[in-house]
Structure formats: structure tokens, C-alpha cells
């Protein structure tokens, strides 16, 4: 098969790949971008219809390209984010080929570069940047395999309540996606059961300002990966309905039945761990800690942001928390659908180079792998907390582009 040659190959045409292309162009580095589907494909096909981005409009930006909006503190729907990325692609004008999937990445025979196998040949490159994003492979536990008549869908394939059969719905996973989907289903008149595991709950707004204003001003979003704590939990936040704090006690007061973690299932009966109270308490602790951090920052800098005592108000514990369910009979409860909001994992098995650890995660330092010339971009906590944010990928891309330039021009 024919082999094409380029200096640098970027795999992935989402926001990370486009930003990498922009940084390489700024440094005069010849490159090619490959995208297996369309630009921003996951935004187009793996988000539900009613999703509202949880980042405020003012924070949505890419290098040298601002997000157009009429309300900096508002939140945008998915179509607006897709158009923003499309417009950014037009601004960057990358050398991109869409509809080209890389099936294998391997070292070249001379070990001084790489070969990316594609359907009609291969591409040889001295440098490769893998920018395929952090949300690649939907994670779905195989707990309900003996219940084939039950409608089951991962959050990546969920679209709207009308997609589901009649009846109650069990949402497994109460992160940002699971919580927002559960609220949407409740508003649609569905009876909802929500399995809540370990989570980090933060206020949408506090002392008159959005969460992300505080993260930026305090510098929390710049926390380097070396200072990342042992907890690997993303905060549960929502941009729906103008943005609001996720409060699971409020969920229960509104009619959603909270459950602990699902541990097993047999013959349509689900076993539930006795950990709901602990999970809620841990989420509350993270919430209270953040309020304290903000209070200390305001005090230390003599800032004029009035105290917000309502932020510490707490609803009474609901019956589903004080007397939690330990088993759930799907048929008896009229549950006709299960939505797995259980997150995503990486899918890098096509990289046939010894750079992945036992969990399939790449070994790297701030995106620079231990294999000379092989890089990663757009992953969570690549170099800092905001590395996977739209507003954070540009700094990492610039660092990688500088490193690549050093290799090429040495």
C-alpha cells in the first residue's frame, strides 16, 4: 500500500486537534490532521437533544477565537457549541481530511518515526499527536445482561424522553450527564430512580458569581497535575434552565427516588449498596469545602461580594435517604428503561507502541510521552485541571508545538 509522508500527524479533528493544528501553523510546522468522521463528531452524535453546556458562555473560547454570545453568564445548547467549533475550523483552516480513520499506529521500520495505517495505505510521520479526546468508549457495566426485554441505552446514545418506552426510568450514574438527564425525565412526567455514587458537588453560583469565575480568579483551574489529589471525581454541575446547583435532596423532594450504587442484578431484581448516605455526605463535604475556600479568598483580598447564607441552607433528608432501598424489582416498579450514565474510558488499543499502562492509559508527562515524537492532547488533567476544557487546550497545544519544533529544528 502507498505510504504518504508528513512532518507531523495529528489524529483527531475535534477542538483539541484543531487547536493543535493552529499552534503548529503558527510555528511553520507542516502537518496533516485526520478525523475519522466529521469535525466535532462527538458533539453532534453523542449528546442528547436537551443538553445544555455546563460551562458559562464567557469561558467558552479557543486560541484567538471567542465564542459569540449575548449573555456572558448564560449557557448554550449543543448546536451553538457545534457551530462554534465549525467556525473555529474555518478560522484555523487546517490541512484536514475527514472520514479517514486510523486503524493502527506503529513504529516505522527505521524506528525514527511512526506509521499510521488507514484504509487505503499509510501515513509516515516523524511526530504524532493523538488528540482523540477523553470521552472515547462508553462504559457500561454488564449487570443486566439477563434482562433482554428491558430497554437499555448509554447516555452517549440517549436523545430525549420520547425515545424511551412507557414507564418509569432507572438512571444509573449521577454525574453531570446522569443528573441532567434525570431532571429532564422528571420534567417530562416520568417516574425516575437515580443511582448515586461517589461524587463532588459544587455550587453553580456563590456570592453572586458563577463557579467558573471563582475557579479562574482563585487559580484552582490552573492547579498542576502534580498537585492533583487522589480523588478522580468530576464536579456535578448543570447549565440547564439558566444554570443551577445540583442538590440531590431537592431531586428527592421533586419526586426522584435516590438509590445507592447498583452492585448486582438477577432476574430483573437489582441489589443496591447501603452507601447512599455516605455518598451524599461526601458530596456535601466537597460543597462546603469549596464555599470555605471562596470565603477565605474574599476575606484575604477584601473583595466586595456579599455573604450568601442561602447557599448553606439544606433540605431535610428525604425518606429514600433515611430508609434507603436495598433492592429494586424492575417489573414491580414499572421500570421500562435503564439509562447508563456511567461515564467513558479511553480507547487507544489501536496504538501498537509500548506507551500504554495496564489500564490502557497513556504514559506521558504533560502530554509528552516516553516515546520520542509521540504526544497526547486534550486528556483530562494532561498538565492542569483545565486541560480538557475548551479554554484550556490552547496552552497545552502550544507547549507540545514548542516541543515538536525543538525536535524538527534541532
Question: What spans do the regions from the language model cover?
Answer:
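Flavin (primarily FAD) cofactor-binding/catalytic cores of flavoenzymes
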Residues: 2-13, 18-45, 75-410
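Redox-cofactor-proximal catalytic regions of oxidoreductases
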Residues: 40-64, 251
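A short small-residue
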Residues: 62-66, 378-380
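A short acidic, helix-capping loop that chelates divalent metal ions and anchors anionic groups
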Residues: 68-72
Amino acid at each position: 500500500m502507498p505510504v504518504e509522508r508528513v512532518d507531523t500527524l495529528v489524529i483527531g479533528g475535534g477542538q483539541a486537534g484543531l487547536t493543535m493544528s493552529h499552534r503548529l501553523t503558527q510555528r511553520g510546522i507542516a502537518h496533516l490532521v485526520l478525523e475519522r468522521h466529521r469535525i466535532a463528531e462527538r458533539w453532534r452524535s453523542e449528546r442528547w437533544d436537551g443538553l445544555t453546556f455546563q460551562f458559562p458562555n464567557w469561558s467558552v473560547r479557543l486560541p484567538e477565537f471567542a465564542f459569540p454570545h449575548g449573555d456572558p453568564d448564560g449557557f448554550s445548547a449543543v448546536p451553538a457549541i457545534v457551530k462554534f467549533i465549525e467556525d473555529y475550523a474555518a478560522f484555523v483552516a487546517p490541512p484536514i481530511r475527514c472520514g479517514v480513520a486510523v486503524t493502527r499506529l506503529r513504529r516505522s521500520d527505521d524506528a525514527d518515526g511512526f506509521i499510521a495505517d488507514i484504509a487505503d495505505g499509510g501515513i509516515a510521520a516523524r511526530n504524532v499527536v493523538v488528540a482523540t479526546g477523553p470521552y472515547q468508549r462508553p462504559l457500561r457495566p454488564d449487570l443486566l445482561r439477563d434482562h433482554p426485554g428491558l430497554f437499555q441505552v448509554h447516555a452517549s446514545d440517549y436523545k430525549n424522553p420520547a425515545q424511551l418506552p412507557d414507564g418509569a426510568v432507572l438512571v444509573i450514574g449521577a454525574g453531570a450527564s446522569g443528573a441532567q438527564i434525570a431532571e429532564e425525565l422528571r420534567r417530562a412526567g416520568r417516574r425516575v430512580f437515580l443511582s448515586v455514587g461517589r461524587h463532588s458537588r459544587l455550587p453553580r453560583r456563590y456570592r453572586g458569581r458563577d463557579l467558573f469565575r471563582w475557579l479562574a480568579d482563585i487559580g484552582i483551574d490552573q492547579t498542576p497535575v502534580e498537585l492533583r489529589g487522589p480523588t478522580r471525581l468530576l464536579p456535578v454541575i448543570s447549565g440547564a434552565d439558566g444554570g443551577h446547583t445540583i442538590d440531590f435532596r431537592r431531586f428527592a423532594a421533586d419526586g426522584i427516588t435516590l438509590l445507592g450504587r447498583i452492585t448486582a442484578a438477577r432476574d430483573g431484581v437489582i441489589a443496591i449498596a447501603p452507601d447512599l448516605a455516605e455518598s451524599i455526605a461526601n458530596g456535601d463535604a466537597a460543597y462546603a469545602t469549596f464555599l470555605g475556600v471562596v470565603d477565605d479568598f474574599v476575606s484575604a483580598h477584601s473583595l466586595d461580594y456579599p455573604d450568601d447564607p442561602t447557599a448553606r441552607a439544606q433540605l431535610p433528608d428525604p425518606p429514600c435517604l433515611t430508609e434507603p432501598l436495598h433492592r429494586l424489582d424492575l417489573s414491580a416498579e414499572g421500570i421500562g428503561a435503564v439509562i447508563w450514565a456511567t461515564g467513558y474510558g479511553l480507547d487507544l488499543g489501536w496504538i501498537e507502541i509500548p506507551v500504554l499502562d495496564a489500564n490502557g492509559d497513556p504514559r506521558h508527562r504533560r502530554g509528552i510521552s516516553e516515546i520520542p515524537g509521540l504526544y497526547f492532547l486534550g486528556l483530562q488533567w494532561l498538565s492542569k485541571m483545565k486541560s480538557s476544557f475548551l479554554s484550556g487546550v490552547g496552552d497545552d497545544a502550544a507547549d507540545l508545538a514548542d516541543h515538536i519544533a525543538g525536535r524538527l529544528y534541532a
